[in-house]
Amino acid sequence: NMGAATKQGPHARAYRAGSPMSPTGCQTCHGDTKAALGCEGCHGAGKAHVDAGGDKTKIRRFEKMSASEASAVCSSCHSKSSHAMWGGSQHDQRNVGCTSCHDVHAPKGDNLLKAASETALCATCHRTIVNKQLKFNHMPVREGKMTCASCHNVHGAANVKLLRTGGTIFESCVSCHAEKRGPMLWEHFPVTENCATCH
C-alpha cells in the first residue's frame, strides 16, 4: 500500500539508499520480478513513480501500450535469431504483440506463455486450425510430440504462413517427410499443393 507514503515506505527507502531502483527494492511490494533483469529494464526509470508515491501513471505500463509499443520494448533485448523477422510479420501486421501471448509476471506455461501450453495459446486465435490438427489421431500434435512452433516461427518468417522451412506447406512437410515428396507410382496431386488439405 503506497497511499500517502510519498517519502516513506519501500519505494522511498530503496530510492534513498542511493541505489538505482533495484529489483530488490521493487520486490518489497511487487514480489518476484525476475531479479536478473530488473524492473527498470522493461518499465523504465522509476524515480518519478517513487517520488509520486507509487503513482502507476508515472511508470511504463504494458497494459496501457499498443501491441507495437510493447513489442518495441521487448525487441530491445529479444531481437536476435528467431525474433529477427518480427517487424512486418503476419502477427505484427495484425496488431498482435509480445504481450498478446507472453506474461512476464504471471505466466501459465513455459516460455512465459499466457496459456498452459503452446497449442492452447495458439488456439485462442486459431481455434479452427488447431481443432483440425487435433482431429487426426495419427497427428504428432495430438500426441504432444510436436507443437505449432515445430513448423511455424510465430515470431516472424519470410513467408505468409510463418513456416520455419520452405515457402509452402508442402515444402515444409517434406523437409521432414522426404519419402512423401515423390515421384510415386500413382501421383497424389493434392500432396504437391498442400499436405494440410488432408493431414
Question: What does each model-found stretch correspond to?
Answer:
Residues N1-T197:
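Short sequence/structural segments immediately N-terminal
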